[in-house]
Amino acid sequence: ICKMPRQSGKSTTVVSYLLHYAIFNDSVTIGILANKAQTARDLLGRLQIAYENLPKWMQQGIIAWNKGSMELENKSKIIAASTSASAVRGMSFNIIFLDEFAFVANHLADDFFSSVYPTISSGKSTKVIIVSTPRGMNHFYRLWHDAELGRNEYVTTDVHWSEVPGRDEAWKEQTIKNTSEAQFRVEFECEFLGSVDTLIAPSKLKTMVYDE
């Protein structure tokens, strides 16, 4: 489970790993799922561009190639869809990549895990990769918090905005001027602030930590 700031290369890095996995493992099924189907297709598009730029000796033959899925000669498939799509229900995946999972509605996230996760947990080498920027104290916060406390099996990975080349204090000040400090704290500091425009201030909500 990855908590990372905007424009830090998180999605591109995971997509590169998925491409490597599909090429060097036969008959695997990979799901690229996002809060919107178009976002998932865009990620698949990046993977397809990366594939086209591989050396010829690394490229598999292509069986299927379209905006929503691709299949290689080694029978490995990559499918792009929204987390709410009925198309992914009942399918068996070797890897599921959940992009910007914090932006999926809570009820859809719960429904997704109840219907799709059993197909993942049944395998010995299957993986779930969750990547997102925080968005309040929702299901992503709960998964992250539980992972930090060792209550689930996810391994936490985070990146500070200052680790991204070209981002320094001057960049931070300029970004805050152009947006707001609260927005910077969420999208770049990756803080789990409460929902915006609430009766209770986000700073107060932050002290009311989920711990059950």
Name each model-derived stretch.
Residues 8, 40, 88, 104-108, ...:
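Catalytic P-loop NTPase motifs of RecA-like helicase/translocase cores
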Residues 111, 162-212:
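ATPase catalytic-site recognition across NTP-hydrolyzing enzymes
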Residues 41-94:
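Inter-Walker segment of RecA-like/P-loop motor cores
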Residues 21-41:
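Conserved SF1/SF2 helicase motif Ia
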Residues 1-17:
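Walker A/P-loop
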Residues 52-53, 59, 103-179:
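ASCE P-loop NTPase helicase motor core
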Residues 4-7, 35, 133-135:
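Conserved H-loop
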